[in-house]
Amino acid sequence: MLMSAVILLSGSLLDPNPGLIFWTAITFVLVLLILKKIAWGPILGALEEREKGIQSSIDRAYGAKEEAEAILRQNKETLAKAEAESDRIIREGREFADKIRAEITEKAHTESQKMIGAAKDEIEQEKRRALDVLRNEVADLAVRGAEKIIRASLDGEVQRKVVDSMIADLSTKQN
C-alpha cells in the first residue's frame, strides 16, 4: 500500500511531463548525432562493402556460368565435328576396302581365265603333238608293213606273220 500512495502523490507514470519529454528528446538527438559521427559511417561503409562483395561474387558466378556454357557449346561442336570426321573416315575406309576387294576379285578372275586359257592351249598343243607322233608311228608302221608285204609274197600265211610281227613291234615300242 505504501507504494500506491507514493504513486498517487507523485502522479501517474503515464502523465506527460513536459520537462521529461524535452530532456528525453534532447538526449535522443544527441545520441543520434554521436552515433552518426562515430558509428553510422563505418556501419554503412561495411554494409556497402559487403553489398559490393556479394554483387561481385554474383557477377563472377554469372561470368563463370556463361564461360562454362560457352565451353560446353564449344565441346559439343568439337565432339560433333569429331564424330562427323570419324564417320567420314570409316565410310571412306569401307569404300576403299570395297574398291580393293572388287579390284582383287576382278584381277583374280582375269588371272584364272588366263590360266585356264593357257592350260587349254597347252592341252591342245600336247594333243596335237600326240596325234602327230601317233600319225608318224602309224605311217611308219604302214610303210614298214607295206615294205614287208612287198618283199614277201602275198601269201595268207606270210600276211599273217607280217601283221603279227607289226603288232609285236608296236607292243615293244609302246612298252
From Swiss-Prot:
It comes from the Bacteria. The chain crosses the membrane at residues 20-40. It is a single-pass membrane protein. Its main location: membrane. Keywords: ATP synthesis, Cell inner membrane, Cell membrane, CF(0), Hydrogen ion transport, Ion transport, Membrane, Transmembrane, Transmembrane helix, Transport. The keyword Transport applies. Pfam families: ATP-synt_B. It is found in: Cell inner membrane. GO terms for cellular component: plasma membrane; proton-transporting ATP synthase complex. One of its GO terms (molecular function) is proton-transporting ATPase activity, rotational mechanism. F-type ATPases have 2 components, F(1) - the catalytic core - and F(0) - the membrane proton channel. F(1) has five subunits: alpha(3), beta(3), gamma(1), delta(1), epsilon(1). F(0) has four main subunits: a(1), b(2) and c(10-14). The alpha and beta chains form an alternating ring which encloses part of the gamma chain. F(1) is attached to F(0) by a central stalk formed by the gamma and epsilon chains, while a peripheral stalk is formed by the delta and b chains. Belongs to the ATPase B chain family. NCBIfam families: ATP_synt_b (TIGR01144), PRK14472.1 (NF011042). PANTHER family: ATP SYNTHASE SUBUNIT B, ATP SYNTHASE SUBUNIT B', CHLOROPLASTIC. F(1)F(0) ATP synthase produces ATP from ADP in the presence of a proton or sodium gradient. F-type ATPases consist of two structural domains, F(1) containing the extramembraneous catalytic core and F(0) containing the membrane proton channel, linked together by a central stalk and a peripheral stalk. During catalysis, ATP synthesis in the catalytic domain of F(1) is coupled via a rotary mechanism of the central stalk subunits to proton translocation. Component of the F(0) channel, it forms part of the peripheral stalk, linking F(1) to F(0). This is ATP synthase subunit b.
